[in-house]
Regions:
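Short, compositionally biased strand/turn segments
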Residues: 1-4, 134-136
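Generic detector of contiguous secondary-structure segments
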Residues: 2-8, 16, 111-121
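Secretory pathway targeting signatures of secreted, lumenal, and periplasmic proteins
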Residues: 3-90
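A short, polar/proline- and glycine-enriched secondary-structure boundary/capping micro-motif
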Residues: 23, 144-146
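Signature of long, low-cysteine stretches enriched in small and polar/charged residues
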Residues: 60-144, 151
Length: 160
């Protein structure tokens, strides 16, 4: 088991898992009152990609490219930090990392429907930071066996 750290996030990875943690640069957007003036706003913070298969170098924030490669036993966990404008909103009202059940997973939760796969998405606040947890299972039929593995990975996440 190794520990992955970055951007105020630490993850204790089980054997056979790999991951990466990175942050996006803040976006420059025009201010509403002075459209010609750009201001820096963070719309995305840290992103963690965790998987029990080799992650491609060019995958999207929510696993595009990686999900196309997934087979039945493969699991992908994405922790995506939203901008501070999400704090205090109903979407991020839940506090702390979620614990998932097999019934939480649905093929229709996926950002891209792929035969046999299923996913779940949960929004929450942890350590004063708004997050989305997005999990993809390579096989919806194996969800009873694989959900405990996913929960082990989630329990290994800590945020400062």
């Amino acid at each position: 088991m190794g520990t992955l750290t970055g951007a105020g996030i630490a993850v204790a990875l089980p054997a056979g898992w790999e991951g990466r943690i990175f942050s996006r640069e803040p976006d420059l957007i025009p201010t509403p009152l002075r459209p010609s003036a750009a201001t820096t706003t963070t719309t995305t913070g840290a992103i963690a990609h965790l998987a029990n298969f080799a992650l491609p170098p060019d995958m999207g924030d929510f696993g595009s490219v990686a999900v196309d490669m997934m087979t039945g036993p493969d699991l992908l966990v994405v922790l995506f930090e939203h901008g501070s404008e999400g704090l205090g909103t109903p979407l991020f009202a839940a506090s702390g990392l979620p614990t998932l059940s097999p019934d939480d997973f649905s093929p229709f939760t996926l950002r891209k429907l792929l035969d046999g796969q299923s996913g779940v998405q949960r929004f929450f606040t942890l350590s004063g930071r708004p997050f989305c947890l997005y999990v993809v299972l390579g096989s919806h039929l194996r969800r009873v066996r694989t959900t405990p593995v996913v929960n082990e990975v989630i329990r290994g996440i800590s945020v400062q």
